[in-house]
């Protein structure tokens, strides 16, 4: 039986990419810097000691990172019995954003330039916001700036609740984000507002509109809920997900995968929030998956909770939890199944600012007759999509080189 499981550790980079300097990210290293902080006792909040990832290490994580950076991360060495094939991949796409990374790993790199709102204050054109407000029947909005999603709630959440005005903000990514309180503004009202924004943003070539619902009574307890929703553009070409679906296969989205691909190539969506629930849902879907199925999970917490918030200890704790669950996944796989662990970009929690970092991503592959050992440096994330196409005997993708 042929099945593929893709476990996408959102933002888990393994060292500055070859073109990182162009992005201001030379020297970034999500995995390496987390390991260093742990080894130095600087990540002992909620956990303690060196970063411990025995199962990821057996799959080749430390070796992939070593080939990327030239040295083993602190606390890791060439002393494990490898069971997986490992490599690291350079992004071909023009950005370091979520859609670009996901689309490229499915065989469709983003070779055009996204639109961005580059001004840190007064970020959005008045013509755009006027159209959104008019269609939504609103008399104003808050924000209009680059911001951290948690900080802006502390600053504007109460005013939003009093006024009913939505909070519009952006970042270095190609994104338009709208934060609204679930109780006072309403979740469905937020979703409708995002749909309007998605339509009005068409001429601006913005990659995503993101609904950022939150709850709480004030700055001390405002918190995002699990009802985030991404409104992405459709990929510019057919991904390997589309091709498997067209061939009669199944593509199961766990978490926000369906949103990122604008539901293209998806046959089933499973909602789950948090590392534990996402892992549980992934296991459940693998247990019931039949022939010619992809189960594709985005573990978003690594990015949203730890990377962007520059929470080194939280990131380390999350990785160790994820690692502790991997034996459950390995036990479910048949000999012919293919397991791939990778990332879509970096988000070094020790780096300046709050944005993504341009990094190589790990490519860890297990099963399907693959021999343990190095896959080397891959020239594109699209090698993953091409390998999946080869595995399922689908029509080859335009980009990427198969390692199967």
UniProtKB/Swiss-Prot annotation:
Enzyme Commission designation: 5.4.2.7
Keyword Manganese in annotation: yes
Binding of Mn(2+) 2, residues: 303, 308, 356
Pathway the protein contributes to: Carbohydrate degradation; 2-deoxy-D-ribose 1-phosphate degradation; D-glyceraldehyde 3-phosphate and acetaldehyde from 2-deoxy-alpha-D-ribose 1-phosphate: step 1/2
Location of this chain's protein in the cell: Cytoplasm
Alphabetical GO biological process terms: 2-deoxyribose 1-phosphate catabolic process; 5-phosphoribose 1-diphosphate biosynthetic process; metabolic compound salvage; nucleotide metabolic process
InterPro entries found in the cross-reference section: Alkaline_phosphatase_core_sf, DeoB, Metalloenzyme, Phosphopentomutase_DeoB_cap_sf
Pfam families: Metalloenzyme
Cofactor: Mn(2+)
Domain of life: Bacteria
Cofactor note: Binds 2 manganese ions.
A GO cellular-component term linked to this record: cytosol
Keyword Isomerase (UniProt): yes
Keywords (A to Z) from UniProt: Cytoplasm, Isomerase, Manganese, Metal-binding
Reaction catalysis annotation: 2-deoxy-alpha-D-ribose 1-phosphate = 2-deoxy-D-ribose 5-phosphate; alpha-D-ribose 1-phosphate = D-ribose 5-phosphate
Annotated function: Isomerase that catalyzes the conversion of deoxy-ribose 1-phosphate (dRib-1-P) and ribose 1-phosphate (Rib-1-P) to deoxy-ribose 5-phosphate (dRib-5-P) and ribose 5-phosphate (Rib-5-P), respectively.
HAMAP family: Phosphopentomut (MF_00740)
Family: Belongs to the phosphopentomutase family.
Record-given protein name: Phosphopentomutase
Gene behind this protein: deoB
